[in-house]
C-alpha cells in the first residue's frame, strides 16, 4: 500500500478539494487562513472535519453577497485543502478586492478574510 494519498474532488466551479492524508484524524473543526494571501491566480484554504458532517465553505463579497460555494457536502473525517482560482459560481473571474470565506457545520461556524489581487 502506498504511504501517500491524494484524493481530489471538484465540488464547485473553479475549486478543487483534496483530502490531505486519510491517516491523520483531526480532533476539532477548524478553518485555517488561506495561503498565499493576497493571492493571484489561486489560493489554498485548509479545513478540518473531526466527524462525518455536512460542511459548507462559501465566499462572500464585502456587501455580504455570496459569490461562490466551494463545498456543500457531507464530508468524512479528515484534513482537507481547497484550491480556489478566484471564480464565482458561474465560472467568471471575480474582481480584485477583499472577500470573506465562511465554514459552517452543525457544530462549527468560522469566518476569515482573503484578498484577491489582479
Question: Where is each model-derived feature located?
Answer:
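Short, compositionally biased serine/threonine- and acidic-rich segments at solvent-exposed termini, linkers
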Residues: 3-22
